[in-house]
Amino acid sequence: MKTSEDYMLTSEDHLLTLEDYLEKDAALFPDKVAIICGEESCTYRQLWNRVTDTAASFHSKGQAIPFVASPTIECLVTYFAIHRSGNVAVPLEQESQFSEEMNKTEEASIPAGVADILFTTGTTGKSKGVMISHSTIIANAENLIEAQGFHHDLTFIINGPLSHIGSLSKVYPIILVGGTLHIIDGMKDINRFFQAMDSPTEGKFATFLVPASIRMLLTFASDRLALYADRIEFIETGAAPISQNDMEKLCFA
């Protein structure tokens, strides 16, 4: 059985895109669970097969392709497949954005090497499309692996929208190390968050929680959260300030 040590890249590897790593994951760890979402899961072999099948259905190159970034395995299959087909992924939070945002992409010249166009939330004005290159995705992933310790046996719970860099940036390192993603639909149902940590995957869990979600867990489920302390490798936070009091409570939960 191959381990995470076997997975370490050498100077002979020339993997330039997330999908290059996904293909390697499927070859090295075909039966490892890649993604879990509700009652559905898929291995790296199954994921890669779905991605290549979907990629074959695209007959364009270099085009911006919009899709609704629902919290599903199919969403990530579509995301990877768009890249694999040589097109640019435009994940949108809801279908109503299609006409407005796609008008913006049609007016733009998309340089070679662009993987995604991600739209900002518009908190400082109108929503803007930001181009993300394949090389940026890989660099982002490598930085997170080095700084936060993403590894092959880690399961990362994603609870945010897959149209947002905050969630997609956690997909990147997990694919590079051949770990597992667990997708849940937000944090409105705390039980789903804990059910994700009850899933029968090897290793430990990590997640990203905005400060409001941390406050919710500490207020309504601190004792329950403490029961999982030995299974949680780290909790990343950001997007807003977190109080010193909440940070201390989280550390000692």
Where are these regions (language model features)?
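Conserved AMP-binding/adenylate-forming
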Residues: E40, A55-E95, P161
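ATP-dependent adenylate-forming carboxylate-activation enzymes
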Residues: M8, R50, A69-S70, V90-M102, ...
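Conserved pre-ATP/AMP-binding loop-to-beta segment of ANL
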Residues: D13-L16, P30, T105-F119, K126, ...
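Adenylate-forming
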Residues: S70, T201-K249
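Conserved AMP-binding/adenylate-forming core of the ANL superfamily
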Residues: S11-H14, L18-E19, E23, D31-H59, ...
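Conserved AMP-binding/adenylation subdomain of ANL enzymes
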Residues: I138-T155, S163-A206, F220
